[in-house]
């Protein structure tokens, strides 16, 4: 359940919710890091749930030694009231036997909070694309029926491509198609739940490979900004996203020179 950091429970009615899927390369989580850090979003609450692997650490967005010791947990909510934006950062994998419970928790919170729309940032294995997905941009989107009428035209104007369905029996028959997001974690199931429960959701994902996924995170967050205009885009160049201090340890500490 959601627990507020303050005495009063914040109102999210009419807000846009952005959350990542724990997927290949952790691209969605890295993109959310950039968003929280750049907008300097304060934490307004966290989730107390047994669906995620427990974790605790220092404040990943600390700007000084004073707030560096602030405790961070596996799922925290940040907010920007002027932009009517809420961000849920998930820092731990979902326990395999609790995936369905986690999806129910998310759907229930989305409905009770009155979010205007939810945006799920995700990724999928690039090596498992089919022929039609090899051409053009690696970015894809999906819209739930309740959001499709409002946003489809806008996405087409941006030149975005909808996630293609692929054949259930490739090379044999194309009559039966399915949505396939390899490496996408909870993406497909949560999107399907939102379609069934009439929850407005957009999924924005990128095909990538495991490794240094920082460029993928920048590509994904720039794509999101083109749609939502969270930060003003300069006439020349791209938006200057602020990398959080925690990224210094993204690949661990350096090689000790004494080894040589």
From Swiss-Prot:
Keywords, alphabetical: Chaperone, Nucleus
Chaperone recorded as keyword: yes
Localization annotation:
Nucleus
The signal peptide here is none
PTM remark: Degraded by the proteasome upon completion of 20S proteasome maturation.
For this UniProt entry, what's an example GO CC term?
A: cytosol
**Which Gene Ontology BP terms does the record give?**
chaperone-mediated protein complex assembly; proteasome assembly
- Check the record and name the Pfam families matching this protein: PAC2 (PF09754)
The similarity annotation says:
Belongs to the PSMG2 family.
Q: What does this protein do?
A: Chaperone protein which promotes assembly of the 20S proteasome as part of a heterodimer with psmg1.
Spell out the subunit comment: Forms a heterodimer with psmg1.
Quote the protein name from its UniProt record: Proteasome assembly chaperone 2
> What organism is this sequence from?
Danio rerio
């Amino acid at each position: 359940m959601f627990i507020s950091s303050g005495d009063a429970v914040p109102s999210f009615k009419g807000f846009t919710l952005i959350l990542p899927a724990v997927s290949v390369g952790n691209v969605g989580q890295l993109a959310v890091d950039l968003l929280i850090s750049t907008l300097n979003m304060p934490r307004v609450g966290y989730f107390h749930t047994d669906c995620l692997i427990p974790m605790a650490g220092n404040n990943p967005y600390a700007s000084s030694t004073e707030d560096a010791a602030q405790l961070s947990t596996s799922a925290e909510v940040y907010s920007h009231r002027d932009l009517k934006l809420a961000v849920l950062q998930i820092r731990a994998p979902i326990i395999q036997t609790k995936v369905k419970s986690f999806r129910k928790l998310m759907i229930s919170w989305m409905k009770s909070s009155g979010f205007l729309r939810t945006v799920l940032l995700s990724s999928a294995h690039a090596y498992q694309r089919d022929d039609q997905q090899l051409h053009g941009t690696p970015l894809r989107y999906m819209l739930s029926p309740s959001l499709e009428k409002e946003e489809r035209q806008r996405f087409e104007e941006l030149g975005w491509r909808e996630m293609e369905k692929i054949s259930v029996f490739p090379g044999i028959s194309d009559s039966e198609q399915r949505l396939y997001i390899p490496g996408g974690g909870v993406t497909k199931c949560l999107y399907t739940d939102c379609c069934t429960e009439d929850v407005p959701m957009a999924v924005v994902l990128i095909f990538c490979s495991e490794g240094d996924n920082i460029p993928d995170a920048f590509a994904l967050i720039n794509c999101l900004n083109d749609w939502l205009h969270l930060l003003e885009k300069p006439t020349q160049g791209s938006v200057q996203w602020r990398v959080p201090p925690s990224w210094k340890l993204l690949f661990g500490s350096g090689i000790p020179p004494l080894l040589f």
